[in-house]
Every structure is written in structure tokens, then in C-alpha cells.
Amino acid sequence: MRVLGIESSCDETGVAVYDTGLSGSAALRAHAVYSQIALHAEYGGVVPELASRDHVRKLLPLVRQTLAEAGLGVGDIDGVAYTAGPGLVGALLVGAGVARSLAWALEVPAVGVHHMEGHLLAPLMEDDPPEAPFVALLVSGGHTQLVAVDAIGQYRLLGETLDDAAGEAFDKTAKLMGLPYPGGPQLARLAEQGTPGAYRFARPMTDRPGLDFSFSGLKTQVLMAWRDSDQSEQTRADIARGFEDAVVETLSIKCERALEAAGTNVIVVAGGVGANKRLRARLQQMAERLGGRACFPRPALCTDNGAMIAFAGALRLQAGQYSPPKVDVTPRWDMATLPAV
């Protein structure tokens, strides 16, 4: 089954073709992503109306490009998957409208995919994928969650952020230190030049039971340290390193607790912050110490992309789960309400 996947929940336009007749990483026939970073940079953040309009301009050309790279014609598609939520309602509607129109014209089934389920399942596209049960750390600009995965489609929320998501904390911290948008990746690169231990910040909520997160206080600590410093380039790098170390250690501590609570030693990490090198290394070390595995998607599939939507959609289409023939999106959507596959 060849499934066309469309992602348009925020500021990336993603399209991919996933072929269930192939195995491992080869099943991803082609994928392409267009990022709107340059469009939103002058505003310091995503402008929803501009995001929607840019999806309108870029989506169909990206579909044509992806099909060409896969060596397929539009008539070779057996199903269409699209992000139905959560996300920006206007941006979601662009992708849903194109997906439903293609499915209707081709007379093939279509299914709306939960954006975060797409992230969660992305590591399963790699060679030697993990098998449930496992714990997933979903860590991005909009979400920081620990989820127990009993089976595909059977999810239990173990913990989540009570305020800022980890990726959001990276971006906001970078902005208050004067780094350009998008700040998170810039801060991570700067942290590589920082001196370990020069600044040590709190590891929020690790001194108490539970699996929830809070990063707003950490952001305030960084702000105070930056204001009281000489604000030199080396100090900027040292503070960035201290902040990154605090976030990475906090996530690692909570992940280990979540594995113990869920009774497994396999951790799956997905979402934009999952591309962070220091986080990957720390969780890999933790999993090996526990005799388990830490599984990640390739860095290109950590950020929003059509590949994860095509894959998640293919699993549901193969299970006979189709969406009603209408353009419908769910900007706020609890992943625990999804049906099992």
C-alpha cells in the first residue's frame, strides 16, 4: 500500500510517500519538507495567518516533487494520510483540504492522523524498530510528554509539562540572550562552546515524586544569570551550556523514573528536541545502564515532516480505519482518545 502523507500543523509543509510493501527505512520512498523559518523570522515567532497562506502556496508543488522523487504518478497512490490535529486550525485545514480532495479524486481512502502520534511512531520507520511496550518521550516546541505505549494506538499519559515545553524553553531562553529566531537550535550549537559547570541551574521538579515537568522557572534563572553577567560571548556560551545541561538531566531523570513506573527498559524519543546531540547521548547511556535501548528517528525526522504522517496513516489504513469523507480537523486533541490499531 502506497500512502501519501501530508503535514501542515504549524510552520513546516511536509509531504512523503510510504510503501508498506517495502521493509525498514527503504519503505519511505520519498519525503520533502519546506520550512517557513525565513517567513516568520522578522516576527520572532509563527504568525498563524501567514503560515496558512504559505501552506496554500507550497503544498501542491511539494506533492508533485515528492511523487516525482518516488518515481510514482498520482494514480499510484492507494491512500492519503494528513495531520488532523493538534495544531493551528488554519494550517491544518489547508492540509486536510488538499488530502481529502486528492482522496476523493483518486477514489482512495483517507485518514486524519494525530500529529503527536506521528512523532511517537517515527522511530519505528528505522531499521530494527522497537516493539511495544515502551515509554515515549515526546519533546518539542509545543509538547513535553512521557507516554506509556502498550501497543500502537494504546497510550497512557505518565507525565507532561505544567507550563513551557522543553523546545519552547529553548527558544525563549535563546531569545532573552539575544540569539536569532529560531533560537533553540542556535542555543544548542552555542552550548557546544560553553564550559561545563561554569553555570549550574536547577533541575526542576526532580526533587519530588512524579513525572511532570516545569521549565518556566529555569528560564527565569537563566534570565537573572544573563542580566547579572558581563554578557560576553563566552559567558553567553557558558550559560547556554548550563541551561542545556539542566534540561537534558531533567529529561533523563524523568525518563528513568517513567521506565521504572511502566516496567520496561526501552525508551523512544521523538519531536524536534529529540535531535539534540547531548540529549541523545545522555539517554543512550541511561538505557544501556538499564540493559535496554534508546531509540530515535534520524534527525531529519525529528522535526515536523510528512513521513511520520504517512507511516502512522498507513498503519491505520491497513487496520481499516478511515476518516469520514469531509474536511475536518481537531486543533486540540487528546492522544489517549485514539483507537487501537
From Swiss-Prot:
Enzyme Commission code(s) on record: 2.3.1.234
Main localization (coarse): cytoplasm
Residues the record lists as binding substrate: 138-142, 171, 184, 276
InterPro entries documented for this protein: ATPase_NBD, Gcp-like_dom, KAE1/TsaD, TsaD
Domain of life: Bacteria
Catalytic activity field: L-threonylcarbamoyladenylate + adenosine(37) in tRNA = N(6)-L-threonylcarbamoyladenosine(37) in tRNA + AMP + H(+)
GO molecular function term, any single one: N(6)-L-threonylcarbamoyladenine synthase activity
CDD domains: ASKHA_NBD_TsaD_bac
Keywords of this entry: Acyltransferase, Cytoplasm, Iron, Metal-binding, Transferase, tRNA processing
GO CC list: cytoplasm
Record GO biological process: tRNA threonylcarbamoyladenosine modification
Residue numbers binding Fe cation: 115, 119, 304
Cofactor note: Binds 1 Fe(2+) ion per subunit.
Location in or out of the cell: Cytoplasm
Cofactor: Fe(2+)
Family per similarity comment: Belongs to the KAE1 / TsaD family.
Role this protein plays: Required for the formation of a threonylcarbamoyl group on adenosine at position 37 (t(6)A37) in tRNAs that read codons beginning with adenine. Is involved in the transfer of the threonylcarbamoyl moiety of threonylcarbamoyl-AMP (TC-AMP) to the N6 group of A37, together with TsaE and TsaB. TsaD likely plays a direct catalytic role in this reaction.
Name of the protein in its database record: tRNA N6-adenosine threonylcarbamoyltransferase
Source species of the chain: Stenotrophomonas maltophilia (strain K279a)
Gene: tsaD
